[in-house]
């Protein structure tokens, strides 16, 4: 199904918990800055995902908080697995990944994205308020070993991390990971000074790239291949290409369909309808009707 701007709905991002075992100073909590209602159960999440398939969803992204804190995560993955779904992936901080990688693979998870903004143990501990970078590296190694690939490393480009980019690129090249360079969205005024313009970084990568591809169903974003390393950029701020080609809807952990990453004023309650046994297709239609590009071309 397309929205009124001609954008197909292909991807569904599920935030399954607000809880996390790290306290990164920049966390935007999937656009939900305060804890709200009741956590969705595994069965409720599965019902909602199954209903989404009718509207063209073919890719599922699971996130949090930290999704590995939910002990029923393998059950969720196993039960949403469907012949119509081409890809089920997970975004994690990687702290618990070594422990759960095999279980996730066995349940039907296809691949993982792991957040890693620095290779400096001291800086990592500071950014995450106590995290152990060695646990993350071991988790990445285990994920690759069990076949949760292609693994992506999510690098958040900020004033305090950008100097780490060359080392991160070398690391990703060495382990065979894809590098995703993400523009920082400051959700609080006091964090604005950490934002940097990633366009010059992308231009520099583009100059050195051996190959360039366009990902049609991922906001028309470019993929660059440079000395064997695949690099992608995620630039949501003031980006008409990102918004104009968005194919994703979201589910909050407390059961609201979220038409737009950058808005929190047009959520559609689907938790209560699913708990009441209603046909929830009309709520997906409402969500899709609410979709409009946050940044529009002039």
Swiss-Prot record:
Keywords: 4Fe-4S, GTP-binding, Iron, Iron-sulfur, Lyase, Metal-binding, Molybdenum cofactor biosynthesis, Nucleotide-binding, S-adenosyl-L-methionine. [4Fe-4S] cluster 2 binds at residues 243, 246, 260. Binds 2 [4Fe-4S] clusters. Binds 1 [4Fe-4S] cluster coordinated with 3 cysteines and an exchangeable S-adenosyl-L-methionine and 1 [4Fe-4S] cluster coordinated with 3 cysteines and the GTP-derived substrate. Coiled coil: none annotated. One of its GO terms (molecular function) is GTP 3',8'-cyclase activity. Its cofactor is [4Fe-4S] cluster. Belongs to the radical SAM superfamily. MoaA family. This is Probable GTP 3',8-cyclase. It comes from Methanococcus maripaludis (strain C6 / ATCC BAA-1332). The gene is moaA.
């Amino acid at each position: 199904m397309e929205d009124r701007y001609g954008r197909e709905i292909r991807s569904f991002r599920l935030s399954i918990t607000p809880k996390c075992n790290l306290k990164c100073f920049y966390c935007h909590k999937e656009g939900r800055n305060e804890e709200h209602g009741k956590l969705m159960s595994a069965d409720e999440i599965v019902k909602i995902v199954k209903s989404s398939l009718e509207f063209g969803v073919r890719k599922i992204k699971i996130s949090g908080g930290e999704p590995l804190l939910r002990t029923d995560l393998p059950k969720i993955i196993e039960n949403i697995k469907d012949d119509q779904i081409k890809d089920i992936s997970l975004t994690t901080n990687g702290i618990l990944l070594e422990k759960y990688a095999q279980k996730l693979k066995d349940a039907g998870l296809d691949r993982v994205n792991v957040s890693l903004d620095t290779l400096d143990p001291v800086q990592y501990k500071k950014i995450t308020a106590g995290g152990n970078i060695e646990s993350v590296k071991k988790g990445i190694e285990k994920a690759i070993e069990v076949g949760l690939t292609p693994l992506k490393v999510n690098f958040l480009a900020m004033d305090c991390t950008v100097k780490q980019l060359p080392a991160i690129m070398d690391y990703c090249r060495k382990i065979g990971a894809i590098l995703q360079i993400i523009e920082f969205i400051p959700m609080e005024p006091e964090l604005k000074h950490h934002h940097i313009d990633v366009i010059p970084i992308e231009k520099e990568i583009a100059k050195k790239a051996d190959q360039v591809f366009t990902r049609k169903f991922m906001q028309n974003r470019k993929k660059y291949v440079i000395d064997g390393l695949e690099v992608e950029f995620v630039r949501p701020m003031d980006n008409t290409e990102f918004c104009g080609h968005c194919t994703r809807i979201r589910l909050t952990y407390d059961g609201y369909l979220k038409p737009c990453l950058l808005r929190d004023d047009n959520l559609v309650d689907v938790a209560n309808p699913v708990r009441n046994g209603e046909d929830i297709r009309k709520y997906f239609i409402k969500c899709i009707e609410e979709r409009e590009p946050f940044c529009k071309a002039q």
